């Protein structure tokens, strides 16, 4: 567990981050199933769906966890989402042609999109909680 500099309180709440991760994965799976049945069309729309899922997951993690660690909880949700997505992709096609769809630019863009969504969601939750605490 990470400790804060001043008060010694927890910054990362793993339960909150886990809830946010589950929410983000469920939103992505349900959204892609309902909106994109052929999996390879409308890449921009799929990116927006993933970004929205991470915003929601990061926001939930920021609301449930400690107020000082809202942003960190959002980041943990995003990193966990990347790990889950890569593990799911690893289960996919295997063999010499199985990884032909991997490109470095696409991977970087996906990861930046995911990390931005989780971080912004956590930041937004922290701002909301600080305003309501006043």
Question: Which residues does each PLM region occupy?
Answer:
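Juxtamembrane/disordered regions of integral membrane proteins
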Residues: 1-134
